[in-house]
Design a protein with these regions (language model features):
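A flexible loop/linker signature enriched in serine peptidases of the S9 family
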Residues: 1-19, 32-38, 48-64, 74-82, ...
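Generic structural microfeature
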Residues: 88, 139, 160-163
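Residue-level detector of Asp-centered blade-edge/turn motifs that repeat once per structural unit
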Residues: 45-46, 91-92, 139-140
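DHp/HisKA histidine-phosphotransfer helix
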Residues: 85
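Residue-level recognition of the GNAT/N-acetyltransferase active site
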Residues: 44, 115
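Structural signal for short hydrophobic segments within the conserved structured cores
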Residues: 28-29, 70, 123
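A short helix->beta-strand "capping" segment at the edge of beta-propeller domains
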Residues: 22-30
Length: 196
């Protein structure tokens, strides 16, 4: 067997403008082939970096120009050896929201954030003891939506859970704006335009 690796693909002939129907595609490995499993790539919002999962448990980022690789989150937050975990870049490219296995409570996942520069600690945002999954940045990166089964029928015997969509705010201002009624929100928008 082989190992999973990450490749870029582009149309080889300039006259072919439609990727799905191109007759010749050029593939190039993003990193040299190794014994490490690399998969689930996501380009950074500015397109200069590529995040990926390595060995099914680590969140890594490669600078596409220099090919320098940094670790963002190590394997102490993942105990599964299946097909990785869900993660997503923040809109400004400075953070990741990701699923983690907090407190070795496998298989139950929590939602966490970690700095994309690889220098910060992973911060567990949910710590629920139930399945929290599928984080998505919303409100221009000021909040994260995620699925949770903490309030529905719960998965106590490995079957039959229900999930709700939850939101966690990254700052007080985003929370305060979210709580405004429609009339107050419109007044706030007018005031912000006037000040700008």
């Amino acid at each position: 067997g082989g190992n999973w690796n990450i490749y870029t693909a582009k149309i080889a002939r300039e006259e072919e403008v439609n990727f799905p129907n191109a007759t010749l595609i050029e593939e190039e490995a993003v990193l040299p082939v190794s014994t490490k499993e690399r998969f689930a790539p996501q380009f950074s919002p500015d397109g200069k970096e590529l995040a990926f999962i390595e060995d099914r448990t680590k969140l890594m980022v490669v600078d596409l120009k220099t090919k320098k690789v940094r670790q963002v989150a190590d394997d102490k937050y993942q105990y599964r050896t299946g097909d990785g975990f869900t993660y997503t870049w923040s809109p400004d490219g400075k953070w990741f929201a990701m699923e983690i296995i907090g407190n070795r409570h496998d298989p139950y996942s929590d939602i966490a954030i970690v700095s994309a520069d690889g220098k910060g600690e992973v911060v567990n945002l949910t710590n629920s003891g139930y399945f929290d999954s599928n984080p998505r940045w919303v409100l221009d990166g000021n909040a994260i939506l995620f699925s949770s089964e903490r309030y529905g029928m719960r998965n106590h015997a490995s079957w039959g859970s229900l999930q709700d969509v939850m939101i966690v705010f990254m700052n007080q201002d985003a929370y305060d704006k979210f709580r405004l009624n429609k009339e107050d929100y419109e007044l706030l928008k007018e005031e912000e335009k006037r000040i700008a």
